[in-house]
């Protein structure tokens, strides 16, 4: 749904991604501190047109085939299927669009990898329930999944339940449609919403296995190993803690239970999850089949607050610049070896197949008069990361399903 555009065509309803603007209001809206549940003329909304894949998917997929791609990762827009998020009957026009898209992929021998929810909580459900803070979102999501699984069984084998699910804790409106009232316990609300998404993910896995024998369902993490800024024990511990926090959701989705460290952390913070009878069994029975993740850079962390200002290579808030790495024009550390390190960390922790589903370089590109972009720097970036994946496969023996 990030690239298709056509946000108000084909019977599609409004979702959270449609009201997150470009510019200074982007992060306040994404974080739930600035309420915006509709569009206005004073903002530019990137999702409205995006790259207009909705109208150009056939030529786009033909170009994929020309490049030799064997997999296309895409997201289905929840509100293109269920405009209000929980409609009893799906939008047939939306189903036909994706059906045609999948057929086009298969025509060229390209396997679709489909994300079920990619930062697009239906606005109608945010207004009705408050987004994922409400348990009823689990039923709405499960209904949505069932519609897709029944319709696309045989066309889609690989599924992801939630895109970068760990971003819920950092950008809660973007990740879960959360808005906060004055005096609300924000941390309690975010972790409760997280529990609802984890339960929904487990239900989706079970449903997919029942309706589509042979299908594989994965989780999706915004990944990137944390390095200690120095070898000081406090920095080493800070890096270990940051990695563990980042793996919270995947611990539950891959191991089927809340880890002890997370329970202790919530206890210290006064967080009390409301769980229904059977939730723990459901999490155990709905574990994912593989681990997918995005990787753009590693992170560097220190307890020395004076170093946090020197962060031009910082891709996340509260990290320090790594003096051993170059940074992109956007300030993100370029670390191909970090991809291999991250892959090994994930496999050592979970012992499940891996899938790199996002990787790339942002840059200030120059568009030539003929429309071409001579981005040798991006080619170099991708080549270096692919070389590290090759080492992870052949030298480390990691089971890598794909790279897209």
Where do the protein language model's features map onto the residues?
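Short, flexible active-site loop motifs that bind/organize anionic cofactors or intermediates
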Residues: 47, 54, 85-88, 329
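Active-site mouth loops of central-metabolism enzymes
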Residues: 42-56, 131-136
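Catalytic domains of carbohydrate-active enzymes, especially glycoside hydrolases
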Residues: 52, 56-77, 111, 285-291
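Active-site region of glycoside hydrolase catalytic domains
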Residues: 1-41, 66, 84-86, 95-404
